[in-house]
Structures are given as C-alpha cells and as structure tokens.
Amino acid sequence: MGAFLTFQKDSDQIYPGWKEKLGYTGESSVQAASFDWQKKAAAAAFVGAQARTGRSTVVRRALDQSSRYADLSLTEEDLVKNGKHVLVAYIMNQGGYDYLATAAHVAAESSTGTNVNVCTTDDFTKTVDALVYYIDPENEEMKIAYPVPLFDRNITDGRAMMCSVLTLSIGNNQGMGDVEYGKIYDIYFPPSYLRFFDGPACSILDMWRILGRDMTDGGLVVGTIIKPKLGLQPKPFGEACYAFGQGGDFIKNDEPQGNQVFCQMNECIPEVVTAMKACIKETGSEKLFSANITADDPAEMIARGKYILGQFGPMAENCAFLVDGYVAGGTAVTVARRNFPKQFFHYHRAGHGAVTSPQTQRGYTAFVHTKISRVIGASGIHVGTMSFGKMVGDASDKGIAYMLQQDAAGGPYYHQKWEGVVQTTPIISGGMNALRLPAFFENLGHSNVILTAGGGTFGHKDGPKQGATSCRQDEEAWKLWKAGTYGDVSLSDGVIEYAKTHEEIKGAFLTFQKDSDQIYPGWKEKLGYTGESSVQAASFDWQKKAA
C-alpha cells in the first residue's frame, strides 16, 4: 500500500479507482512526501503539455526537473572561462512536451537524476548535476553543461575515458519516451580535461619525415586502398602493393581485410614487405603501409600488431596500424594507441553513418565523431570527400579538417582550443581520382592530407603506377595554378594546360571521361582528343602488373 501512496500519479493512471478499493480517503500527496530523509530531495512535479499541431492530440506527461537540472542564468562565456564543464549542444525537437522540462529530464538522466526523487540524494550529489544552460525551442536547440567530476577515470593511471563521456551525453537519454529525437551537433572539452586524454602520438609530420618531405608544408600523401577489397590471395595482394608502390606513397588494407582464411596474415604480410622493399629499392623513395589490426579481443589486436612489426623489422616505422574505430569501439582505439604509440594510428570510421548521417535524428554528427577521434588519439581519420567524391558530404565539411589539424578552431557551436594536442590528419577516400583533387584542394585551402584512392588509381587506364602519379601531378597542377603560372584562367583550364605536357593526367582524362566532361568542359578540344569515350581502364593489361 505504501507504493500506492508514494507514487500516486502512477496509481491514478495504472490503477483507476484504487483509492476507493483500498479505502483511502486522503488527498493526493506530493510524491514521496511521507518519507522524511532528513527533509532532503524535495519531490518533482508532473506537468503536461499539448502535442504540437499535426501530431497526436493526447496530452502527454513529462517529469519536470527543471528546478534542479536547469539554470538558464549561466552564460557560455563563464562556463568556458571557468573550465569545469564539458559542454554539449543538441538538436532536440519539442516532441509534444514542455521543452525545458524535457531538456532538464535529459540532463538529469545524463548525470545524477532518475525518474523519481530518491532518498539517497545528498548535498554533494547536487554539485555534480548536469545543467541545461540554454534552450531555443523554436530552433530545437538545447545545451547542457556536464561537470568534469561526473566522468569516470582509470584506476591504473587516472586518465580520462571517452566511453564515460559518451555513456552520459549520448547514453540513456537516447531511449527516453519524452525525447522524440536528440542529436549532438557539437561538444566542447575544457583544456584542463583534455590533458587527461591520450591524444595522437603521431601525425602526418611523421609520414613527411619518413618520405623525406618538407616538415611544414609536405603536401599530399598519395595512397591507395587495395582493391578488390576482398578476394585477393597473398601473392596477388603483394603484387597489387608492388604495382601501386611504383608511383604512390601509402598503401592500406581496406577495412574488412585482415586474416581471412584465403589470405592469412602470416602469408600476406611477408608478401607486402617484399613488395615494399622492392619498390623502395627501385624508386629510391620510402613507402608506407597501413595494416588492419582490428579485432574483438584486445589480445588478438596486440598479437597482430607484434607479428606485423616483427615482419617489418627495421622498416617498422613505415607501418601504420588501422583500426575500425567506430565498429570496434573506444576500447579497440585505446588498445592500439597505448600498445603501439610509435605507429601512425589510422582510424577508419566504417559504420559511422548509422548514427552520423543527416538522415539519422539521434546520435551525433560526423563532425562530433571526428573531433572525438582526435581527443582519443587518432593520427589520421577518414573524413569523406566533402562532396567531391562519392561519399555523402558537403563542401562546408572542411570545418571538420580544420578542427582536426588546427590548434584552435570553431565548430557549429563551440570554439575549441587544443593547447598543443597533436593534430589528426584528414584521410580522404571514396570515389576520388586525380581529376577531382584540384577542386578539393581549392575548397580546403591546402593539400596536407592523406589520399586513399582505390578505383581512382587502380582504375587508371595505364595502371596503378600511372594512377598514383596522376594524383601527385594534379596536386602540382593546382599549386601552379594557385601561383598564377597559367595566368588569369579558371582552375579547370589550368589543370588542362598542365595535362598537355603530363601523360599520366592526360590518361586520367581519358579514363574517367564522365568526370572529365562534368568538371572540365571542352577538355577534348583543348587536349586535342578526337576519340570516342572508352570503357574505363579497358586498355590496362592487369596481367603485366604495370611494371
């Protein structure tokens, strides 16, 4: 009977007529009012709100905890200045409930609260409440400040853990009935808290050093993804590495490649090492390889990493480690970062679209996911192609690259100061080829990124060596156009002018003719080409392996 008297709102809704049936004649009391826990934790009230026009007209009820979990007098400027809170900006629709009440419910569920007041709450507990400090119902925006002490720390070294940040900020609040949808669009980490995360150990500077590049503006690292992504056995896989390595810098496993029964690591990696040694000897240039060590079991990841480094031997610094960071999770990321701090940590985001896609109204955005990758230690992460390739994206996604590479950068809502945290290198992939690169560089403003072009190099009509070379040449073409070498002409005309004396780029025009027609109108006449459109890569004899 005590439960009926304590949770009377539930009693009324679930057990109509309970008062008469139990012989209770008292008035409805405030929830838990008869329980005196040193007079702590005053009870919350329930409020109802009419659903929005066009939605259900049923009046729904939400727990209003705004008196405790909201403080709209707080200013973002002061919160940032004090440096004691992680700030999170959400897009959350009104969903038929009072907006502030729902936002406060999110803050409560994401910190110290629950759906009822509990007797164990004390004065200290309230000091670590998450607080709603800003709402804009019309634009469906809310911001919550999370006190740093809320977040879990390692018992081994006191370091911070991203899984704790995500558990609170994007955990149970994603499944609450009064939150129709909510998505994180930006997150701010105070510098004092950032210092407790690992951050990257290596960056593109390490690649430039190995490749003998300028350490300030070393430019594009021309890379590829071995294609087909699955189906090659060890020897053909090694031959593909050799073919690309004749013209390119960097070769990576595709994200599903690892230790398939038809291409086991103990047979494939030796073939890769042999191919790389041959390419280095023949070209006089260093080569890099990114090996996939992703696994469910941390012990398996470590075993893979140790085996690969043993095979590379004196060339160990030429080897990066790839981890499918989204699907394998933060534990796998930290295993790689902490056990192999001397290796370039290649973060692949396969699967991220399940929560980051613009079509998804829950989770977080690609910007947030990418920013988190720098915090937890990625040396490089795939960022799509900013609408210049086949992946979903927009030219404005260059803000993602700025957040990864700069020491201070603005996001959709917050300006983040990194205070010396090593940069994370944008890795671009997905439908890219030489012809698409100049406009990409112009939009980004520089070419200090890693390219991993699979079809864009292995699809070149003359082979992967020429495909890789064409990408390097188009970076040079963009730089020359930028410097005014070709006079006052458009970027497309500048690239065409460069192509007149560079056969590899000219071959890209002939290979990717749909791109040629769309990006470089009039290219055939300007290059003096009179032939018909040919089937992509038809003239490349794969059996010769592009020696």
UniProtKB/Swiss-Prot annotation:
Its cofactor is Mg(2+). Mg(2+) binds at K252, D254, E255. It holds the Pfam family RuBisCO_large. The keyword Metal-binding applies. Keywords: Calvin cycle, Carbon dioxide fixation, Chloroplast, Lyase, Magnesium, Metal-binding, Monooxygenase, Oxidoreductase, Photorespiration, Photosynthesis, Plastid, Transit peptide. The modification N6-carboxylysine is found at K252. It is found in: Plastid, Chloroplast. The keyword Transit peptide applies. GO terms for cellular component: chloroplast. The record marks K390 as: Transition state stabilizer. InterPro entries: RuBisCO (IPR033966), RuBisCo_large_chain_AS (IPR020878), RuBisCO_lsu_C (IPR000685), RuBisCO_lsu_C_sf (IPR036376), RuBisCO_lsu_fd_N (IPR017443), RuBisCO_lsu_N_sf (IPR036422), RuBisCO_lsuII (IPR020871). It catalyses: 2 (2R)-3-phosphoglycerate + 2 H(+) = D-ribulose 1,5-bisphosphate + CO2 + H2O; D-ribulose 1,5-bisphosphate + O2 = 2-phosphoglycolate + (2R)-3-phosphoglycerate + 2 H(+). Binds 1 Mg(2+) ion per subunit. Signal peptide: none annotated. GO terms for biological process: reductive pentose-phosphate cycle. Its EC number is 4.1.1.39. Substrate binds at N172, K229, R349, H382, S429. RuBisCO catalyzes two reactions: the carboxylation of D-ribulose 1,5-bisphosphate, the primary event in carbon dioxide fixation, as well as the oxidative fragmentation of the pentose substrate. Both reactions occur simultaneously and in competition at the same active site. Belongs to the RuBisCO large chain family. Type II subfamily. PANTHER family: RIBULOSE BISPHOSPHATE CARBOXYLASE, RIBULOSE BISPHOSPHATE CARBOXYLASE LARGE CHAIN. Homodimer. This is Ribulose 1,5-bisphosphate carboxylase, chloroplastic. It comes from Lingulodinium polyedra. The gene is rbcL.
